């Protein structure tokens, strides 16, 4: 991956979770940003749900500002409701001779998404990101100590990432079933 000071042997881990922090799609890429990852992650999520026999598509997708692009908002067919905050940095248009910034193609989309996120429903939905995807990465990195990949090469590291995500789901399932009271045996 390209970094500030040259090139590093690094990867960009992607994951999609449910509201209960169950990982439904996981991928590893060598792209330095998330701009091109929304479409593949939506496809991986749809494939996982279809393989599990769940015909229902996701209703809302919450993503961070790294996924913000005109293409991600307009060119994905059958996309769920997207809540992606506009990028905080980047070109806002070159100043015109009269001093006002020129209008860019994304100004209307940016204003619409900002309004959607500023609404009460938008704020409530987007706040769920803090309790769905962020804890998953925190649990994998900090609690389980998986801050670096142990193997080399994209294929090997992708297998390791998917193994980490699978064991995360198994731990969720184990903790969920362990917290339930044991069924009482029937009298004979």
Segment roles from a protein language model:
Residues 1-188:
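Anion-binding and metal-coordination hotspots
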């Amino acid at each position: 991956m390209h970094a500030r000071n040259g090139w590093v042997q690094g990867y960009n881990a992607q994951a999609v979770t449910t509201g209960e922090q169950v990982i439904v799609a996981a991928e590893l890429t060598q792209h330095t940003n998330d701009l091109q990852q929304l479409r593949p992650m939506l496809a991986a999520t749809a494939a996982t749900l279809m393989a599990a026999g769940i015909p229902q598509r996701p209703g809302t997708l919450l993503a961070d500002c790294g996924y913000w692009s005109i293409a991600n908002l307009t060119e994905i067919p059958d996309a769920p409701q997207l809540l992606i905050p506009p990028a905080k940095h980047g070109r806002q248009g070159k100043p015109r001779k009269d001093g006002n910034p020129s209008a860019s193609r994304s100004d209307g989309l940016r204003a619409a998404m900002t309004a959607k996120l500023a609404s009460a429903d938008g704020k409530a939905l987007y706040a769920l990101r803090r309790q769905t995807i962020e804890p998953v990465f925190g649990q994998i990195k900090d609690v389980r100590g998986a801050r670096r990949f142990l193997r080399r090469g994209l294929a090997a590291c992708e297998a390791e990432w998917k193994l980490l995500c699978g064991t995360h789901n198994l731990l969720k399932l184990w903790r969920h079933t362990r917290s339930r009271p044991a069924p009482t045996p029937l009298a004979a």
